[in-house]
C-alpha cells in the first residue's frame, strides 16, 4: 500500500505543480528534493541517538548538494537527487539503524522519489522539445 500511496502522491504533487505553473520557477523541484532529503533527520530525532543524527545528516547533505546543483546548474541534478534518494531508500536500513523510521517509510519514500524523478525528467524533456519547436517556428 505504501508504494501505491507514494506513486499517487508524486503524481498529484508534480501534476498539480505543473498544471498550476508552480514549477515554472527553477527552484521548485530542487526544493522538493531538499525536503525529501530531510525526512530521515526528523526520524533521527525520534531515534534520539547523536550517531544516527550525524549519519542521517551526512546522507541528507549528499542529496541537498545535488538539489542545490539542480537550482544553480541544471535541473537534471534535481532529477538525480530525487532518483538517487529513491535508490538510497532501498538500502537505507543497511546504512543507518534509525529506530525512528516508520516501517512503511522506505517503500513510500522510494515510490514517491522515483516517480517524481521520472515525472521531472519528462517535464524537462517536454519543455526542451517545446522550446526547440518554438525556435524553429520563429526561424521560419
Features from the language model and the residues they span:
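Small-residue-rich segments of transmembrane alpha-helices in multi-pass membrane proteins
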Residues: 34-45, 63, 86-94
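Structural signature of hydrophobic alpha-helical transmembrane segments
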Residues: 1-10, 50-58, 107
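Short, hydrophobic transmembrane alpha-helix segments
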Residues: 18-26, 45-49
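Hydrophobic, membrane-inserted alpha-helices
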Residues: 11-15, 36-41, 58-66
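Membrane-water interface at the C-terminal end of transmembrane alpha helices
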Residues: 15-18, 68-76, 111-135
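Cytoplasmic-side transmembrane-helix entry/capping segments in multi-pass membrane proteins
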Residues: 26-35, 54-59, 78-84
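Membrane-helix boundary connector in multi-pass membrane proteins
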Residues: 72-79, 88-105
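N-terminal signal-anchor/start-transfer transmembrane helix
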Residues: 6-22
Amino acid at each position: 500500500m505504501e508504494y501505491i500511496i507514494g506513486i499517487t502522491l508524486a503524481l498529484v504533487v508534480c501534476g498539480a505543480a505543473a498544471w498550476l505553473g508552480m514549477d515554472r520557477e527553477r527552484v521548485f523541484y530542487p526544493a522538493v528534493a531538499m525536503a525529501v532529503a530531510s525526512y530521515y533527520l526528523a526520524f533521527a530525532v525520534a531515534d534520539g541517538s547523536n550517531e544516527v543524527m550525524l549519519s542521517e545528516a551526512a546522507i541528507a547533505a549528499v542529496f541537498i548538494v545535488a538539489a542545490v546543483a539542480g537550482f544553480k546548474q541544471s535541473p537534471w541534478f534535481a532529477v538525480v537527487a530525487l532518483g538517487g534518494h529513491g535508490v538510497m531508500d532501498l538500502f537505507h536500513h543497511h546504512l543507518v539503524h534509525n529506530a525512528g523510521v516508520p516501517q512503511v517509510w522506505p517503500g513510500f519514500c522510494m515510490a514517491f522519489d522515483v516517480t517524481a524523478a521520472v515525472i521531472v525528467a519528462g517535464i524537462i524533456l517536454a519543455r526542451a522539445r517545446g522550446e526547440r519547436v518554438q525556435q524553429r517556428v520563429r526561424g521560419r
